[in-house]
């Protein structure tokens, strides 16, 4: 009898010692009011938020601004984003053309007549020179037209280039200025027009030679064969 009661006593004492103790501040798990307060405390962040003086850093902004756009107005520049002073470049329109839609909408709202509307669209007929800013309208594939008299389209100081030369430099291969128009097959009409197959019409000092008659033997018919170059 005593031998069977001792193990039972040890089991009861061990279970009592291993049971978790409830602290004085711990709420009763069967209390409904305490359970509601625990659910409310779960929504409170365990750590306090950063002070407004230290809300900058990686991924942190100095101010909170919720917008539906991708970038803030102060950060609208970057790759593929240019502000209005930098809207020119390759494939970028000038500032004046960017404001075309706004001006057109304003005219539509004012209900102007058809004549004023047609005059407005005539200002933007030529879209070639509007692609770039006016000081940068020259380049590869962009040349100043000879028949174009508008100084606003292209700068006249840059109208030369590949295949385009100023009047001062319009000589070259097959092109010679009037003071340099002599050469192979090109002679001046005055004192340098003699040579291979070329003779002076007035001066007969160089009309003799192998197979060449002198000036005394030359007839009037032969003189008609000569012509000025």
Curated annotation (Swiss-Prot):
InterPro entries in UniProt: Allatostatin
Domain of life: Eukaryota
Biological processes, Gene Ontology terms: neuropeptide signaling pathway
Gene Ontology molecular-function annotations: neuropeptide hormone activity
Residue numbers covered by the propeptide annotation in the UniProt entry: 19-48, 62-80, 94-130, 144-152, 214-229
Entry's family note: Belongs to the allatostatin family.
Cited function: Neuropeptide inhibitors of juvenile hormone synthesis and gut muscle contraction.
Record's protein name: Allatostatin-A
Organism expressing this protein natively: Agrotis ipsilon
């Amino acid at each position: 009898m005593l031998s069977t009661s001792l193990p039972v006593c040890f089991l009861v004492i061990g279970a009592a010692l291993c049971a978790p103790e409830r602290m004085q501040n711990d709420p009763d798990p069967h209390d409904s009011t305490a359970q509601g307060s625990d659910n409310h405390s779960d929504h409170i962040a365990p750590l306090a938020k950063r002070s407004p003086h230290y809300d900058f850093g990686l991924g942190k902004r100095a101010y909170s601004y919720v917008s539906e756009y991708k970038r803030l107005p102060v950060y609208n520049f970057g790759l593929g984003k240019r502000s209005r002073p930098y809207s020119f470049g390759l494939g970028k329109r000038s500032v004046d053309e960017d404001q075309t839609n706004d001006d057109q909408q304003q005219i539509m709202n004012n209900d102007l007549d058809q004549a004023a509307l047609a005059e407005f669209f005539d200002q933007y007929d030529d879209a070639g020179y509007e692609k770039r800013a006016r000081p940068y309208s020259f380049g590869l594939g962009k040349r100043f037209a000879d028949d174009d008299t508008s100084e606003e389209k292209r700068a006249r100081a840059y109208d030369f280039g590949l295949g385009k030369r100023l009047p001062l430099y319009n000589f070259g291969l097959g092109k010679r200025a009037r003071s340099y128009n002599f050469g192979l097959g090109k002679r001046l009409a005055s004192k340098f027009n003699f040579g291979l197959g070329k003779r002076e019409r007035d001066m007969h000092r160089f009309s003799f030679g192998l197979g060449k008659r002198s000036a005394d033997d030359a007839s009037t018919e032969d003189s008609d064969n000569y012509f000025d170059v």
